[in-house]
Design a protein with these regions (language model features):
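Nucleotidyltransferase catalytic core that binds NTPs
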Residues: 1-179
Length: 179
């Protein structure tokens, strides 16, 4: 199938979802890929706004995108709003710290401080053109012993990192080099 056809199907599914599934945003997300293969298109970010979605936290829906294999990674900024990774990372120096951040510890922050000071010593790296990312993988989110993701635990970590003024990435990258 061509990319145009796939986008057309996603568009029709989105319109259908807006009319008939607006009260169930998670279900609406899954319906976006009805009648197309997940490898045909990737949804990098999603943002539900408006009076019908006041109780929806877009960070949870971003997590759903990664969990359902619709994208490999999602990001949100210190304000808790979703970010489009391609837009915010384009032509940036990237310093990524991977961890579970359950909770954020002094060791995590010391690693970040030490690595950033080393990173900025490179003459090609400009601090104001650098994006610092705290990455949590799906594996880290599932490491609670049950194999399932505890959404309240995820939200607690996300809120803590955002309150610290940090940019958060949730990814399905098992290997660090893929990040």
């Amino acid at each position: 199938r061509s990319q145009q056809e796939s986008l057309g199907v996603v568009g029709v599914n989105l319109i259908y979802g807006a009319f008939y599934q607006h009260d169930r945003p998670r279900k609406m997300l899954r319906y976006l890929f009805d009648h197309i293969d997940k490898s045909a298109i990737e949804i990098d970010t999603i943002n539900f706004t408006g009076p019908l979605f006041e109780d929806v936290d877009n960070r949870i829906l971003s997590l759903e995108l990664v969990k359902n294999g619709m994208t490999e990674a999602v990001m949100f900024g210190p304000d808790g709003n979703n970010l489009l990774p391609a837009r915010v990372l384009y032509k940036k120096n990237i310093l990524a710290i991977r961890g579970s951040f359950r909770p954020v510890t002094n060791v995590n922050m010391d690693m970040f401080t030490s690595s950033s000071s080393l990173f900025y010593q490179d003459e090609d790296v400009e601090e104001d053109n650098t994006m610092n990312i705290f990455e949590i993988t799906l594996s880290n989110l599932r490491s609670n012993g049950t194999g399932f993701i505890d959404e309240q635990d995820f939200m607690d970590r996300a809120k803590l990192l955002c309150a610290m003024g940090l940019t958060v990435m949730i990814s399905n990258f098992k290997e660090y080099y893929r990040l």
